[in-house]
Amino acid sequence: LLQYAPITAKVIAGMPELGIVSRIGAGYDTVDTEACEKAGVWVANSPDYGVGEVATHALALALASIRNIVAYNRDIHAGTWYFQSSGTLPRPSTMTLGIVGLGRIGKRMAHIARNTFKRVVAYDPYLIDGDFPAYVERVHSLAELAREADVVSVHTPLTSETRGMLDARFFAAMKRGTYLVNTARGAIVNVPDLLMALDSGVIVNPITAS
């Protein structure tokens, strides 16, 4: 039973009586599933763990980013706060939220954010149209989501397919001044490409998992 400890092939080899690895959490990218399969070890996760908490946290981070809360807080503590230091900030009610990955957390995020943003769009190639709530507009590619969204919230698991998925091509399709929140796994975002997008002004106030 674990939460954060990595279960590698070496760990599995050193525990010959191991029968099951059960993770407290939805993701299991820290578990070497191939090594477990070879050793006959079962792997289990907790798919409903923290769904509401992560979705609420993602929305809070998105709003903090849009309203420049962190910078304002820093300025207040430094005694340099000025109400126009960030210029005119956008209203979420005029913005489109784009969700990458419409699983449990992505759907909860869409549900709690739908009355905050003007529109909610989502990309998830593994779902059929009937799996999309009525208040979520489906987009059919990451590039389409990048073009439509003012705020991008990432809720996809880390797999060989999604590793580095948000890269230079994705950022190039974005509007200038887009906000990015990644509460999934840091490796989904190509960090060097993100830094270039940040330097160019395409991305504003990015928040991403490590």
Please place each PLM-identified region on the residue numbering:
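Rossmann-fold NAD(P) dinucleotide-binding segment
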Residues: 6-19, 32-35, 160-180, 191-195
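Rossmann-like dinucleotide-binding domain for NAD(H)/NADP(H)
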Residues: 43, 170, 176-210
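Redox-cofactor binding/interface segments in oxidoreductases and associated redox assembly factors
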Residues: 1-2, 23, 153-154, 182, ...
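A short helix->loop->beta-strand "cap" motif at the edges of active sites that frequently abuts
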Residues: 15-20, 39-41, 117-118, 176-178, ...
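Short glycine-/small-residue-rich Rossmann-like dinucleotide-binding loops
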Residues: 4-5, 26, 150, 156-158, ...
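Phosphate/diphosphate ligand-binding glycine-rich loop within oxidoreductases
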Residues: 1-73
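Phosphate-binding beta-alpha-beta segment of Rossmann-like dinucleotide-binding domains, i.e.
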Residues: 39, 47-96, 108-111, 115, ...
